[in-house]
Amino acid sequence: MIVCIDCGHGLPTKGKQCLDGTKEWVLNSRIGEYVEDLLSEKGITVVRSDDRSGKTDVPLSTRVRRANEVADYFISIHHNAGIKGGHGGGIVVFWYSSKPEREKQARALYNRAVGITGLKGNRSNPVVKKAFYVLRKTKCPALLIECGFMDSVRDLPIIKTDEFALGIAQAITEFVLNDIK
């Protein structure tokens, strides 16, 4: 079993930052590192499709190619912004497939993440079918999780904590382990 973790964006990606200037990739990568550690402890091989240093924003086509070469699962980790003029909030999970099980997987990941972190989304449907490139083009099961809103005064102090990052990582790990049974 190989899981590809995709920590979205890179340090130089313009506009991808928190209200306090913290770059999105920093938050994404911290969660990705926790996921890698937790899955590795369970004997699952983890590869990353992003640049571990964050110095470059790896093109989406390269991320997908890396996943398609080896992965049995693809999880893209992001943090959200810009919804409702800073009034968006909570976790959102995106999926894209003609297979009905993909929506069930997305809902399972969302429920696990909210169950562990308590950061419930304020959207009417926080599990969304969306044709993002990394979801459309990967051959294995693929989900994209937005781990709270960087421009939300409610979410920001929560998403910057190690406790939250570890909680999201635990949710991803538990989801993968449960789904492969």
Regions found by a protein language model. Give the residues of each.
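Active-site-adjacent mobile loop/cap segments within catalytic or ligand-binding domains
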Residues: V3-D6, G15, E69-V70, F74-S76, ...
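Catalytic-core regions of hydrolytic enzymes
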Residues: I2-E101
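A broadly tuned preference for mixed-charge, low-complexity surface segments
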Residues: L19-D20, V46-R48, R52-D57, R123-P141
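Generic detector of leucine side chains in alpha-helical contexts
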Residues: L11, L19, L27, L38-L39, ...
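Active-site-adjacent substrate-binding region
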Residues: P100-V128
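Hydrophobic alpha-helical segments
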Residues: D20, G86, A106, K160-D162
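Sec-exported extracytoplasmic/periplasmic mature domains
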Residues: E36-I44, N68-D72, Y110-G118, T173, ...
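Extracytoplasmic/secreted envelope proteins and their assembly/folding machinery
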Residues: G32, E36, V64, E103-Y110, ...
